[in-house]
Amino acid sequence: MSFPTVFIDGDQGTTGLQIHARLRDRTDVRLLTLPAAERKDPARRADALNACDIAVLCLPDAAAREAVGFIRNPAVRVIDASSAHRTQPDWVYGFPEMADGHAQDIAHAKRVTNPGCYPTGAIGLLRPLLQAGLLPRDYPVSIHAVSGYSGGGRAAVDAFESADAATPPLPLQVYGLALEHKHVPEIRQHAGLAHRPFFVPAYGAYRQGIVLTIPIELRLLPAGVTGERLHACLAHHYADARHVDVTPLADAAAATHLDPQALNGTNDLRLGVFVNEARGQVLLSAVFDNLGKGASGAAVQNLDLMLGASSAA
């Protein structure tokens, strides 16, 4: 029996290593790998990219674009984990749960662009509310997120974990202070916002896991929209989703904190709606593993859909 061949271009980076670990013991796919001395050889990479059934690109943006250019075999399908193609109209956005029928779009796609980690949480919260008309498209969205330092890739991991670091890393590093984070166009486009959201990301002094929050002022929403309606919309949208759950309102009301590491090691996304009707304020939250649903887990979920596993969504 012939099994689909998967080539991970960039399998030594943070995301590539995680995807390889998720696939190496599976018996339904065959991993095509290059010897260490050939991993950066353009000719050998091109050979592998054209010999596989599905190529998974775990590369910097420029290298990912180059890799796509190497592909001449029309049968090769691609999952790109970089941000190079996330707003390109000829690539299918790899968030199966974001819209009805979207898992099938991924299943039949030739080119799939894996979502960014922060956009996964932001789009997961915003898109259903915008589609339902509960949140105006021109709402001034503000997004705050803290990720484990692995979200910064190998350089950040080395900086936080190196015993030889001259200066100990800060417990919290707010970054993107120029307000030009590369995830902003992706969030705006796939959430369906009319304007750029205000996005403030940070790295915490822990390895992995994200907590992302979006404050909502009910007075700026259409008349009659309440926190309960926002929650009901999200709960209905994700009712059949295998990897997305919405915390019941009563559980959210009883919560005292959000743990960014709560879903580490999973491919799950947990959404929450915290309501203070008396103040007219709501806090939307998303908790997930930046290396799971925010990266490698999402890539493998998309791979499974492309291989015909409808249960992946």
Swiss-Prot record:
GO terms for biological process: L-arginine biosynthetic process. Keywords: Amino-acid biosynthesis, Arginine biosynthesis, Cytoplasm, NADP, Oxidoreductase. It catalyses: N-acetyl-L-glutamate 5-semialdehyde + phosphate + NADP(+) = N-acetyl-L-glutamyl 5-phosphate + NADPH + H(+). It is found in: Cytoplasm. Pathway: Amino-acid biosynthesis; L-arginine biosynthesis; N(2)-acetyl-L-ornithine from L-glutamate: step 3/4. Its main location: cytoplasm. It comes from the Bacteria. It is an enzyme of class 1 (oxidoreductase). Its EC number is 1.2.1.38. GO terms for cellular component: cytoplasm. Pfam families: Semialdhyde_dh (PF01118), Semialdhyde_dhC_1 (PF22698). GO terms for molecular function: N-acetyl-gamma-glutamyl-phosphate reductase activity; NAD binding. Signal peptide: none annotated. The active site is at C117. Belongs to the NAGSA dehydrogenase family. Type 2 subfamily. Catalyzes the NADPH-dependent reduction of N-acetyl-5-glutamyl phosphate to yield N-acetyl-L-glutamate 5-semialdehyde. PANTHER family: N-ACETYL-GAMMA-GLUTAMYL-PHOSPHATE REDUCTASE, CHLOROPLASTIC-RELATED (PTHR32338:SF10), N-ACETYL-GAMMA-GLUTAMYL-PHOSPHATE REDUCTASE, CHLOROPLASTIC-RELATED-RELATED (PTHR32338). This is N-acetyl-gamma-glutamyl-phosphate reductase. The gene is argC.
